Amino acid sequence: MKEKIFIMSGLLGSGIASLFGGWDLALQTLLLCMVVDWFTGGILLPAVFQKSLKSENGALESRAGFKGLCRKGMVLLVVLIAARLDLLMGTRYIRDGVCIGFIANEMVSIMENAGLMGIPLPEMIKKAIDLLKDKETT
């Protein structure tokens, strides 16, 4: 029974990885950044530091967490579509470019979370965060 579960898990995992264009460094890095951002912004900031920007009192809020997970799911759908476009066009750079763009966005969010936790950030990172915040409001 255990062997069947392992086989089915392997088949499912490889099928999903194949849909996303393979289990390469770009996808692994994006998923790692997404998990770190979710953990730091969705768990640590509200639960430990009470400094979440997504809730009124800075604490954990299930609705904010659900919306964040929905956004992460949408990012993965965009990567999936980019991988399919690569297949359609016989290229290899569309999905990688999409992954790199989302990785950069996740990294800025992780740095913002670190700043809210009191970790000193380089001035360049602070300016990048401010620039992205300005874009969100306009």
Regions found by a protein language model. Give the residues of each.
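Short, strongly hydrophobic alpha-helical membrane anchors
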Residues: 1-20
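Helix-coil boundary and interhelical linker segments in multi-pass alpha-helical membrane proteins
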Residues: 16-27, 85-94
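Juxtamembrane helix-capping/reentrant segments at transmembrane boundaries
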Residues: 51-75
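Hydrophobic alpha-helical transmembrane segments
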Residues: 4-8, 27, 31, 73, ...
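A cytosolic-side transmembrane-helix exit/cap motif
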Residues: 46-60, 113-124
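Canonical alpha-helical transmembrane segment with a positive-inside/aromatic-interface signature
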Residues: 107-138
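Mid-chain, well-packed structural core segment of small domains
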Residues: 66-103
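Alpha-helical transmembrane segments of multi-pass membrane proteins
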Residues: 30-41, 75, 79-83, 101-109
